[in-house]
Regions:
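Outer-membrane beta-barrel "beta-signal"
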Residues: 220, 250-264
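Solvent-exposed loop/turn segments connecting transmembrane beta-strands
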Residues: 65-74, 96-105, 128-140, 161-171, ...
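Detector for outer-membrane/organellar transmembrane beta-barrel domains
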Residues: 137-199
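Transmembrane beta-strand segments that form the barrel wall of outer-membrane beta-barrel proteins
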Residues: 57-66, 87-98, 119-131, 153-164, ...
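Residue-level signature of outer-membrane beta-barrel architecture
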Residues: 82-84, 113, 148, 162, ...
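Repeated loop/turn-to-beta-strand initiation elements of outer-membrane beta-barrel proteins
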Residues: 85-91, 117-121, 152-156, 181-186, ...
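Hydrophobic, lipid-facing positions within transmembrane beta-strands of outer-membrane proteins
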Residues: 56-58, 74-78, 105-109, 140-144, ...
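Outer-membrane beta-barrel initiation region
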Residues: 2-101, 113, 131
Length: 264
């Protein structure tokens, strides 16, 4: 190793000194490249410090709930988000399938812009699909809302929807994790749906349409796999009578079941 280090040094000693002026006046790309590389590293660090780092998260959840009459429903949710702290894109898909019926789908594509450290404003499109209906199986509307944390760290989504046939509605979803241990966690939650107007062929009654208040208890096998049990109280005001559906009365029910959630 010593001789290897000495060899290039002896070559330098034998260099023709008449070349010094030429070397001094020629461009030095290696030095410039190092400076450019250093500037790029500093710029990347600056972006990360100011919320410019791109990240992605996907959550999939599926649960089976049953009411007091033994009627069951499979509820599945898929959510993925990608972007920076300031700008993100959300894709949210909800699927509900009652026993002996086709699934109902609710999909949203949202652009999310940071308002503050705890709140984003979101806007986008909503797509509904219900193959149980004879007409109006597919509908598209606009959505605007907010996503973030309230005081006491309740994660909250609040959206206003405007769709076909003068359908205007509002939804609120809020939840919070309460740690019992590092792996056993309570999650109280509240889901509310308010109908302001609905002139569709399958109109729902206006004002408070549905409510679900529940408590989820989950066990985190790890940060990616989380089975849970769920108990809840549900309220449904019912539907208006139209040419395509019969009038239905309000309904209160207790729900219980379980499911599993994946994060990756």
């Amino acid at each position: 190793p010593i001789s290897d280090q000495q060899t290039p040094q002896s070559d330098v000693m034998q260099m023709d000194h008449s070349q010094h002026h030429q070397l001094a006046t020629e461009p030095q790309p290696v030095v410039q490249q190092k400076q450019s590389s250093s500037d790029g590293t500093d710029h990347a660090s600056h972006i990360k410090e100011h919320g410019g780092q791109v990240y992605q998260q996907t959550i999939f959840e599926s649960k089976w709930l049953r009411n007091e009459d033994g009627e069951g429903i499979l509820k599945s949710e898929f959510e993925t988000r990608i972007g920076t702290d300031e700008n993100k894109v959300f894709i949210k898909i909800h699927a509900d399938q009652a026993e002996s019926q086709q699934a109902e789908y609710d999909a949203k594509l949202l652009y999310s812009r940071m308002l503050s450290d705890f709140w984003d404003v979101q806007a986008g499109l909503r797509y509904l699909n219900n193959q149980n209906r004879e007409v109006d199986q597919e509908q598209v509307g606009a959505v605007v809302g907010i996503h973030g944390l309230t005081p006491y760290f309740f994660e909250t989504d609040a959206y206003l929807f405007v769709g076909q046939d003068q359908q205007v509605s509002f939804t609120l979803e809020t939840e919070r994790d309460v740690l019992l241990t590092q792996k056993l966690i309570f999650k109280p939650y509240l889901d509310i749906n308010v109908i302001f107007s609905d002139d569709s062929n399958y109109a729902k009654k206006s004002s408070l349409s549905t409510t679900q208040l529940g408590l989820e208890t989950r066990y985190e096998i790890n940060k990616k796999v989380m089975p849970f049990v769920d108990v809840a109280y549900g309220y449904n005001k019912g539907s208006e009578e139209t040419a395509w559906q019969q009038h239905s009365s309000s309904k209160n029910e207790r729900l219980y079941g379980g499911g599993i959630r994946f994060k990756f």
